[in-house]
Every structure is written in structure tokens, then in C-alpha cells.
């Protein structure tokens, strides 16, 4: 679906798709997370269920999944691609020194901070029409949500629910954004052998996250192009009908009604 905004269009998930994605995420947790922490993870998702379900993955229409439900949609894609990238690495004799649980847990929670803190959403709708129209800001950061980096807030939420993580999960979550996060440079640009990273989990997660973002960006672009093409065709049809005014009256086929019908189709109910 496409939703028109003051600044353009955006992809939109239906209520059914949002519910289905959330159910898939819970099933993924049930399948891959083990031990005592599974129940703690499930409690966190139950406590903030509505916020998890509705959270967008980003704020601007030209970013990835700037739509309600975009967060979970993105997380599911990163989980799927992480497992596929790991398989590709294995096929090429690359080092795999982590479990599937560590990989999936990290993929699920790498953007956890985008849900917000314990009381407030991270993103709220942008109510400034100028910024929506001219800057494509569908959402904006919630001023009630105390500043933390997305990654730091993820760790804060996990510790609040007493959810333990392994060292590899910590590194994986910390470095999923790669060099796009300034704080990651000290991990990724080490020139001393003893300081170099000792796992590959972060590289696989970063590749999966980047791939997911590119896919989501393409889906948004294709949706916009499709609606623009359809709109162009509707305008073309209206122009053709209006040009019939040059014809003799008896040659016209109720131009007023046809023009009105096409106008309504393009711009909606005028009432």
C-alpha cells in the first residue's frame, strides 16, 4: 500500500501485516532463544507489545522503513539475511565462531533502542507540515525520550529486564552499524594485533543490516514510482477528456460527468 504524505508518499503496512510480523518475531524468539533468558525476552516484548508492533525503523521517507510497523519488518529481514550471510561465509571457509542463537539474538536487538525507553516512544509523528513536505520527515525524535544512542539504549533495556548477553552478542550489537557510528571506529580501525576483533559476528550482522536497508529503500522507491506513474496516467486521461471541449456538443459523451469521475479518482472525495 501507499500512503500519501505532505512531502510525498510512503510505504504502509496493513494492520494484518503488522500483526503477522509481530507474531513472526515472537516465533523467532521462541525458536532461537534458549535458557532462562527466553522468558525474560518474551516479557520485555509483552510489556511493550504495542510499541514494538507500531515502531518505525527510521524517521525520513527516503530512509528505510519510515512507516508504522517498519521496525519489526526490518528486524525480521535482518535475522533472515544474517543466517543467509553466515551460510555464505561457511561455504567459503570463513571463520564462524559463534552460535546461531548469538547471531539471531544480536540481529533481533541491534536496533532495540529505536523502540524508546521504558516510558516513551523514540519516534513520534512529525506535526510540522513544512518539515514533512520539504524534508520528508514522517517522524521525529521524541523530546520526552532522554538522549542515548540507539545502541546504548538497547543495552539499557536488556539490562533492565535482566537479560544476559554473551561477549560476542555485545560486540555484534555494538558494531552492527559498522563505520556509520563514530563510536565504532576504535573497534574497527585498530592497528595493533592484540586489539583486533576476534570474532566475525559483527561483520555478518553489518552486511545483513546494510542489505536489509537497501532492499527496504528499493521497495519504497518502487512504490513511489508506481504511484507516480499511475497519477501521471490519470492526469493524462483528464486532459484528454477536457480537450473534448473543442468538439461539437453533440459529439461529446457527457464530458462533465467523465471529468468529474476522473477528478474524483485522482484526488478523492471533494466533500
Enumerate the language-model features and the residues they cover.
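Acidic/His-rich, divalent-metal-binding segments that scaffold phosphate/diphosphate chemistry
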Residues: 3-133
Amino acid at each position: 500500500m501507499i500512503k500519501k504524505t505532505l512531502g510525498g508518499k510512503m510505504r504502509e503496512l496493513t494492520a494484518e501485516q503488522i500483526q503477522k510480523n509481530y507474531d513472526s518475531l515472537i516465533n523467532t524468539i521462541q525458536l532461537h532463544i534458549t535458557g532462562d533468558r527466553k522468558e525474560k525476552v518474551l516479557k520485555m516484548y509483552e510489556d511493550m507489545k504495542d510499541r514494538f508492533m507500531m515502531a518505525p525503523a527510521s524517521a525520513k521517507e527516503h530512509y528505510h522503513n519510515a512507516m508504522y510497523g517498519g521496525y519489526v519488518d526490518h528486524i525480521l529481514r535482518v535475522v533472515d539475511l544474517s543466517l543467509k550471510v553466515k551460510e555464505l561465509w561457511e561455504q567459503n571457509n570463513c571463520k564462524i565462531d559463534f552460535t546461531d542463537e548469538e547471531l539471531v539474538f544480536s540481529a533481533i536487538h541491534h536496533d532495540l533502542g529505536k523502540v524508546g525507553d521504558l516510558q516513551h516512544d523514540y519516534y513520534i509523528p512529525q506535526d510540522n507540515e513544512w518539515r514533512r513536505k520539504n524534508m520528508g520527515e514522517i517522524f521525529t525524535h521524541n523530546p520526552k525520550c532522554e538522549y542515548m544512542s540507539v545502541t546504548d539504549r538497547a543495552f539499557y533495556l536488556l539490562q533492565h529486564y535482566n537479560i544476559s548477553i554473551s561477549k560476542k552478542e555485545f560486540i555484534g550489537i555494538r558494531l552492527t552499524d559498522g563505520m556509520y557510528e563514530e563510536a565504532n571506529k576504535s573497534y574497527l580501525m585498530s592497528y595493533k594485533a592484540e586489539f583486533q576483533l576476534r570474532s566475525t559476528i559483527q561483520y555478518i550482522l553489518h552486511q545483513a543490516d546494510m542489505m536489509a536497508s537497501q532492499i527496504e529503500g528499493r521497495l519504497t522507491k518502487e512504490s513511489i514510482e508506481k504511484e507516480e506513474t499511475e497519477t501521471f496516467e490519470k492526469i493524462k486521461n483528464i486532459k484528454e477528456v477536457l480537450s473534448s471541449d473543442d468538439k461539437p456538443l453533440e459529439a461529446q459523451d457527457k464530458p462533465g460527468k467523465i471529468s468529474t469521475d476522473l477528478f474524483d479518482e485522482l484526488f478523492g472525495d471533494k466533500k
